[in-house]
Amino acid sequence: MVDTASKTGFISQIIGPVVDVEFPGGELPTVYSAIVVGEGESSVTCEVQQLLGSNKVRAVSMTSTDGLKRGAAVVNTGAPITVPVGVPTLGRIFNVLGEPVDEMGPCEATAGLPIHRAAPAFTDLDTKPSVFETGIKVVDLLAPYKRGGKIGLFGGAGVGKTVLIMELINNIARAHGGVSVFGGVGERTREGNDLYAEMKESGVIDEKKLDNSKVALVYGQMNEPPGARMRVGLTALTMAEYFRDVNKQDVLLFIDNIFRFVQAGSEVSALLGRMPSAVGYQPTLATEMGVLQERITSTTEGSITSIQAVYVPADDLTDPAPATTFAHLDATTVLSRGLASKGIYPAVDPLDSTSTMLQPEIVGAEHYATAQNIKETLQRYKELQDIIAILGLDELSEEDRLTVARARKVERFLSQPFFVAEVFTGSPGKYVSLADSIDGFNRLLDGEFDDLPEQSFYLVGDINEAIEKAAKINAK
C-alpha cells in the first residue's frame, strides 16, 4: 500500500464535483493521479486535473461528493485510476473505478492496468487494411467493417441497435474467438439494466459459468457525476487493450454513447473554469477525442474494433461533437425506421450506410461490383416508389417492373435471422460467410431466381435456404 503519512493532504474547497486539496510542500500528486477521501465503502475517489500553485491541486470526483467536508484527509495514491483486467472481468458489470456493481461479489482479477496509457507506437501498428467479417450479410457486403477500425452506429429509439450490438458480440466470439467490452457512457440506467438482462437471456453472459461469457460491461450512467462519465470510456478501453495486447485476441469495443463522452468533457471543462469554444464545447474537444480514439487500433498482436453509437444533437451533423467524431470513423451503419416498420431486420439502411473499405483494391473486384449492383437496384426502386404510389405497378415499363421485383427480393434477402433473437423469432440464427453472400446476391441480380416468390427471401441465411423455403411455399 501507499506510504500515507507523507502523502496526505486535506480538502480546502468543494464546489459540486470539483474538490480542491492542499498537500504538504513537495508532496503534490501529478495530473491524472487518483486521490482518495475517506476509507472503505464511503470513500470518494477523485482525479487530479490541475495544479493550482501554493501546494494546491484541483480534482474532479468520480462519485458523489455528498457528505465531504473541508479539512477532511485526502490520500494521494501516486498512480492513475487502476482497473481490473483479464478473463475474470467477463460477465461482470463495473463502474468507472473498476469496482463490480452487479452484487456478485468481488472480481477475482489478479492483473490491473491504469486507465491513462499511451496509444500503441507506429512500429506496433498493423497498417494493412483487412475486412472484419461479422457474418451479417448487409454489413459485410455493403458497408464492411475494418479490422481495428471505428464504426459509427446511427439510429433512433426502437430500430434494433441493442439486438445488432448483441449479435455482433455473439458472432465475434463464435467466428473470431474474440471477446467484447461494452462501455455504457452517460446513457439511461434502465437501458443498461435491460441490456444486461437481454444478454443473460440470449446466452452472451453465462451466469452459471462466468468465464464462458463473451462480454464485460462498464457503466457510467446519466446520474453519475461528469468526471465518471468522462472516464468510463477509458476504463472500458483499458479492459479491451488487455485482451488485445496480452491475450492476443480480436476485441469488439462498444461505446454507447460517444456524444455523452464529449458532453461530460464539456461539463468538466466548464467546472474547471476553462474558456468555452464553439457552441459552448470545451476548447480541448479534438484532443480529448483523439486521445481516446488513437488507442482503438489494430496491432501486430490483435485488434480492437470499435462500434460507437452516435447521438446527433438536434439532428445537426455540423455540431462540433458529431463532426469531431466523424473525422475518426472508418464506416457508418445507419439504422432505418422505414425498414424496421416493414419488419426487415437488421434494419440497416443499405443506401445510407458507408464504409471506406468498400474499394475494389481492398475487398476485390467481385465484391465491389456486387455491392454497387445492389445499391443501383435499390436506388432505382427508391426513385420509382413515387410513380408506383400514384399510378400503380402496372404503369411501369417491363424493365422497371423487373427491377422492382428484384429490388424487393434484394431488400428481403438483406434481412437475416439472428442467434440472439431466436428466443423472440423462433427462427434459428444464421452466420453467413462473405463468399456465400456475394454468390447469392450475384445470382439473384442475374435473374436466376426471378420465378421464386419474394417471401422466400425473407429472414433466411444463404441463397440455398431461400431456394428450400421457396420449395416449401410452392408445395403448400
Swiss-Prot record:
The keyword Ligase does not apply. It is a peripheral membrane protein. Its EC number is 7.1.2.2. Belongs to the ATPase alpha/beta chains family. Produces ATP from ADP in the presence of a proton gradient across the membrane. The catalytic sites are hosted primarily by the beta subunits. ATP binds at residues 155-162. It is found in: Plastid, Chloroplast thylakoid membrane. It comes from Emiliania huxleyi (Coccolithophore). It is an enzyme of class 7 (translocase). F-type ATPases have 2 components, CF(1) - the catalytic core - and CF(0) - the membrane proton channel. CF(1) has five subunits: alpha(3), beta(3), gamma(1), delta(1), epsilon(1). CF(0) has four main subunits: a(1), b(1), b'(1) and c(9-12). This is ATP synthase subunit beta, chloroplastic. It catalyses: ATP + H2O + 4 H(+)(in) = ADP + phosphate + 5 H(+)(out). The lineage of its organism: Eukaryota, Haptista, Haptophyta, Prymnesiophyceae, Isochrysidales. GO terms for biological process: proton motive force-driven mitochondrial ATP synthesis.
